[in-house]
Design a protein with these regions (language model features):
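Gly/Ser-rich, low-complexity
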Residues: 2-10, 14-118, 123-142, 156-171, ...
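Small-residue-enriched core segments of transmembrane alpha-helices in multipass membrane transport
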Residues: 140-150, 171-179, 208-214, 245-259, ...
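Generic multipass alpha-helical transmembrane bundles of integral membrane proteins
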Residues: 198, 205-322
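Intrinsically disordered, low-complexity linker/loop segments enriched in Gly/Pro
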Residues: 146-159, 177-206, 210-234
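Membrane interface segments of multi-pass transport proteins and intramembrane proteases
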Residues: 130-135, 235-250, 349-358
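Membrane-helix cytosolic exit motif
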Residues: 334-342, 346-350, 354, 369, ...
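Helical hairpin unit composed of two closely spaced alpha helices linked by a short loop
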Residues: 314-355, 363
Length: 395
């Protein structure tokens, strides 16, 4: 009898446990669903209240090629990112980069063909020097060929310089459109300390770093190209050391300025995140502990609002990064193509016996690295600031 009672009790306990488990799970799922709906509602409410006009205007200014990474409208892109859909796969991204490099190389093809044809003519005329042309005539012909090649290459280098100036300027304008929105959302999340250190840094980036790139680094590129070009006109003209000076000066300034910027950003970001995290947790504890009766509900509502703001902040930051990529990928691809195509032309021209032209092409191709570094530095500085804004407020 006792055994039967124990069995009945155990069966009842098992059924009770199973019932309780499913009952608690249903309640948990319902609560989770309610929380998710509350966060979603809060997210879209925050999104509707944001002033995104400057970002929308910037987005509208993108060309068709630049819109490859950010297809669709600006608001649609933002909502996709909030839902966790980037819209661009890694494979598509890499494919687009190689496509842009190939497109840039094809764009330089007419100029490079011109350089090779003139170099072939110069080599042939040089071979005729002993038979039909006297030395003075040969030098004049070689100088004319070199001048024609120099005109083509310097013209392309000037186009690359203009492209770099425009790209750095567009990155500067994007920071002016994006960071006021991010700083507003950081303030709403309680990131006063992070905003306090990041706000002047945005100003330094917009005015200081881009100014250094435009007024010092890019003129160094111009000086290096001109010195390399003039220094290869004749063996009697030696300007290699001066060309190296311009190139080295631009490189050192870039490394110094961006290293100092990243160091300050790293230290300030860590301190800001720590202080803001303590303040937010203290606010949660204070509301929950000292507000009578409804303190717990207010604290939960506080968390929902913070979660919505955090989602919007991260989505806005990610949108800014995608737009940044769409702006800089094409110019960087074109600069890489410029570098590679000059090296290729130097290799083709070298066996023809016109060493001055080959050396000039190779040296100018090395100067192109300064332009790539200028855009890459501005891009990584922008990326680091967005990353700091995204992680500075722990929610």
């Amino acid at each position: 009898m006792k055994t039967k009672i124990i069995k009945i009790f155990l069966i009842f306990a098992v059924f009770l446990a199973i019932f309780s488990f499913f009952r608690d799970k249903n309640v948990a799922y319902a609560k989770q669903g309610e929380d998710e709906k509350s966060v979603e509602d809060g997210t879209y409410e925050v999104l509707e209240k944001l002033d995104l006009e400057s970002l929308e205007d910037y987005y509208s200014s993108l060309s068709d090629d630049e819109s490859a990474f950010v297809a669709g409208g600006f608001k649609e892109l933002l909502k996709r990112l909030i839902d966790g859909n980037v819209g661009v796969s890694f494979k598509d991204f890499i494919g687009e980069i190689f496509s842009l490099i190939l497109k840039g190389a094809l764009g330089f093809l007419p100029s490079i063909i011109t350089v090779v044809v003139i170099s072939v003519m110069s080599g042939m005329l040089k071979g005729l020097n002993s038979g039909f042309l006297n030395e003075n005539t040969s030098e004049i012909v070689n100088f004319a060929c070199f001048s024609a090649i120099l005109t083509v290459i310097v013209s392309e280098a000037a186009n690359m310089l203009t492209l770099t100036i425009n790209t750095v300027g567009r990155v500067e304008k994007l920071s002016a459109a994006l960071f006021p929105v991010l700083l507003t959302l950081m303030t709403a999340l309680g990131g006063a300390s992070g905003v306090g250190f990041l706000k002047p840094l945005v100003g330094v980036f917009s005015v200081g770093l881009t100014k250094v790139v435009k007024t010092f680094v890019l003129p160094c590129f111009t000086g290096a190209v001109l010195m390399n070009a003039v220094g290869n006109i004749s063996p009697a003209v030696k300007l290699d050391k001066m060309a190296d000076f311009f190139k080295k000066a631009g490189s050192i300034v870039l490394k110094t300025v961006f290293s100092a910027f990243f160091a300050y950003l790293l230290i300030g970001g860590v301190i800001g995140k720590t202080v803001d995290g303590v303040m937010i947790n203290a606010a949660r504890f204070g509301v929950k502990s000292y507000v009578p009766i409804i303190g717990g509900y207010v604290s939960d509502g506080f968390d929902v609002v913070l979660a919505g703001c955090a989602l919007v902040k991260n989505a806005v930051g990610m949108t800014g990064l995608l737009i940044l990529l769409s702006v800089v990928v094409a110019p960087v691809g074109k600069l890489i193509a410029f570098d590679l195509i000059l090296r290729f032309a130097a290799g083709v021209v070298e066996p023809l016996g016109v060493s001055g032209i080959s050396d000039m092409l190779m040296k100018i191709s090395k100067c192109a690295g300064l332009l790539i570094a200028a855009i890459a530095g501005a891009t990584f500085a922008f990326f680091a600031m967005v990353l700091t804004a995204g992680t500075s407020v722990g929610v």
